[in-house]
């Protein structure tokens, strides 16, 4: 069996209320555990609409048929009214995931992090992490041990800002294998477990079709020579594409692929992991910069 980290990002109110419970049902049916990363503050995701002025983002939205994929309540959330606080209103749903799966911190305000993390001061970065960590800790009633920034918007500043929170690992970047990020002072930050596989919205219309997506992503996972990590979203695979994801889980079992929480990808001795940095870069199918793994010799 090939172990593949299954990361599930839960970004919005609707994804937490509707998509995530459906994913719990699908995973339970196959006896699969995963890692859920939750946004717990205001759902302002609709404010991303201004990015339609950027050609690359507009093309992505058209390729993925965003209106039917996400629904208008997600696409307009936080525009004409203040965004609802997800953790405050949907704590029971988050606790349901934490009962059987690894749960980590995604964001306080997903939109704000994805939009402003690149220019925020260290104080602002730290405050956003603290708000989310405190809220999620109160909900699940145990320490939060892992995190993954919204939209993979991470660099060395973000890695440093997370140090005081003592996460066991972070999944903030795209890359090939777990590594130890080198800090400016010569010390090592918490281990990073990069995402290695494209997401549905990155691949669709560029390298595959909706009908061929499951075969495409399984072939990509089987060809992965690093430590494969695959990300899905509660707003997509838990709602509009839940049937397709159900088929993917069955196909994966038949092809010898075992999905698992990200923590199971860590070796007992993390000191043996390679050393690297989280730097800004670009990946096909995604608008704007993301954190990328750069290994150091």
Swiss-Prot record:
Signal sequence annotation: none
Catalyzed reaction equations: 4-deoxy-4-formamido-alpha-L-arabinopyranosyl di-trans,octa-cis-undecaprenyl phosphate + H2O = 4-amino-4-deoxy-alpha-L-arabinopyranosyl di-trans,octa-cis-undecaprenyl phosphate + formate
Higher taxonomy: Bacteria, Pseudomonadati, Pseudomonadota, Gammaproteobacteria, Enterobacterales
Organism: Sodalis glossinidius (strain morsitans)
Name assigned to this protein: Probable 4-deoxy-4-formamido-L-arabinose-phosphoundecaprenol deformylase ArnD
Family listed: Belongs to the polysaccharide deacetylase family. ArnD deformylase subfamily.
Biological processes per GO annotation: 4-amino-4-deoxy-alpha-L-arabinopyranosyl undecaprenyl phosphate biosynthetic process; lipid A biosynthetic process; lipopolysaccharide biosynthetic process; response to antibiotic
Pathway entry: Glycolipid biosynthesis; 4-amino-4-deoxy-alpha-L-arabinose undecaprenyl phosphate biosynthesis; 4-amino-4-deoxy-alpha-L-arabinose undecaprenyl phosphate from UDP-4-deoxy-4-formamido-beta-L-arabinose and undecaprenyl phosphate: step 2/2; Bacterial outer membrane biogenesis; lipopolysaccharide biosynthesis
Entry GO CC: membrane
Intrachain disulfide bonds: none
Molecular functions (GO terms): hydrolase activity, acting on carbon-nitrogen (but not peptide) bonds, in linear amides
Reported function: Catalyzes the deformylation of 4-deoxy-4-formamido-L-arabinose-phosphoundecaprenol to 4-amino-4-deoxy-L-arabinose-phosphoundecaprenol. The modified arabinose is attached to lipid A and is required for resistance to polymyxin and cationic antimicrobial peptides.
Enzyme kind, highest EC tier: hydrolase
